[in-house]
Design a protein with these regions (language model features):
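HDAC/HDAC-like amidohydrolase catalytic core signature
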Residues: 1-112
């Protein structure tokens, strides 16, 4: 999980991780189109983690190409807040991980 801190503040991760179910309901009204339950944080970790593993395999030439279909999505999440059904931006987390840990210098992100 340290790779999340390349992209997000401790406060943001803490907000998503440590809220109880009653607070999740309150947060749903604070953020745009975010629905939460007791498994939301763990699901978001798996989503970002799967993309990290995929990108690591590409960078290390273990695979030649890839296509990731990941749920829950992440492309609407802001750098400091959940938004649009997304808690964390999976692509930002994975790319920042590769830049910090695998010495990747450049990336191209296409989101349509």
């Amino acid at each position: 999980m340290p790779c999340f801190y390349y992209t997000y503040t401790y406060q943001h991760v803490f907000l998503v991780e440590f809220n109880k179910r009653s607070q999740y309901i309150e947060l749903e009204h604070v953020y745009d189109s975010v629905y939460l339950n007791s498994s939301s944080f763990e699901s978001a970790l798996y989503a970002a983690g799967s993309l990290i593993e995929l990108l690591e395999a590409l960078v290390k030439d273990e695979i030649r190409n890839a296509f990731a279909i990941i749920r829950p999505p992440g492309h609407h999440a802001e750098h400091d807040a959940p938004m649009g059904f997304c808690l964390f931006n999976n692509v930002a987390v994975a790319v920042n991980h590769c830049m910090k840990k695998l010495d990747v210098k450049k990336t191209v992100i296409v989101d349509w």
